[in-house]
Amino acid sequence: MANIFENCSYHSPYEPYYLNCTNTTNQCTLVQDVETIESIIFWIDFLIPCTLFVVACFLNAYYLSILVPEFTEMNDITKKQYIFMVSRAISALTACVIMLALRILQLITSSFTIYFLFFLIDDLSFYSLLGSYVGSAILLYLATIRPILYSNRISVRTVYKFAIANLITSVVLAITTAMFQAADLSDGPFQCDLKHCQPITNMIMLVLILTSFLIPIVTLSFVLVTLCFYKNRSESIGDFTTDNSVSKSARTRLAWTLFTFTLITLTEAIPSFYLVGTSIGQLLSTWILCAHCYSIPEYEKFGYNIQKS
């Protein structure tokens, strides 16, 4: 079969993807437009995340600069309430810094190691954040509903142990998921494509994502509903031993935590479910690819992200 681009004065790296798109007489201009669109998409995809990472790094660093000095001066009773908050802030700051560095490194190389590190940091920060939200909600529940148990049985050392367990669990999960995610996008120690492990790993990833989202949502919702029922029950029986201001503050903090986690869920769910569905994009037929190329006005309007092998 003749190369439809052989007479073009300029040769684009995207030509191999459109060799079978023969239903056109303007192939040279079309492939140049494709390259322009891909270049714009690439730089937008690079600049916007980098800008957000820089802003997030600044905000997390500022937050830590205020929180850490206060935390060191707290007594043991107060520290129990802030251990997961400090852990969450450190995890977020570390993730922002490393992911910003990895974004820049992706311009230089696309090796399996780079992809693995990128997904490892992303997954580690994600799972540790989920664990910190669950831990904070449980401590808030115990401090409000079971204050005696919270004071006598839950020590600072106990909370530290839970925080370390959360970190270890996050590392194990992150290493497992990052390895398969990186193998989907780059050649690694083992082959993972449509003919081998990808269908199974995509299903495993889907289950892990759904479970990871479900556990914190159920925990936060349960604690929030329990606190609301506890407030109504105390008022109905005339029990005013509980400090109303403390109870109201607990419900407000939990509601904002649930709202914040919902935003995090949305930002993590979109790319995660996109990754789970990559096999669908890889199965696009030639006529669909060519249809996008032929419809260059619509192509320029919406763009089309081609996965490069």
Curated annotation (Swiss-Prot):
InterPro entries: GPCR_Rhodpsn_7TM, Put_GPCR_Chromadorea. Belongs to the G-protein coupled receptor 1 family. B0244 subfamily. The chain crosses the membrane at residues 39-59, 82-102, 114-134, 162-182, 204-224, 256-276. Keywords: Cell membrane, G-protein coupled receptor, Membrane, Receptor, Transducer, Transmembrane, Transmembrane helix. The keyword Thylakoid does not apply. GO terms for cellular component: plasma membrane. PANTHER family: G-PROTEIN COUPLED RECEPTOR B0244.10-RELATED, PROTEIN CBG16518. The keyword Membrane applies. This is Putative G-protein coupled receptor B0244.4. It comes from Caenorhabditis elegans. Its main location: membrane.
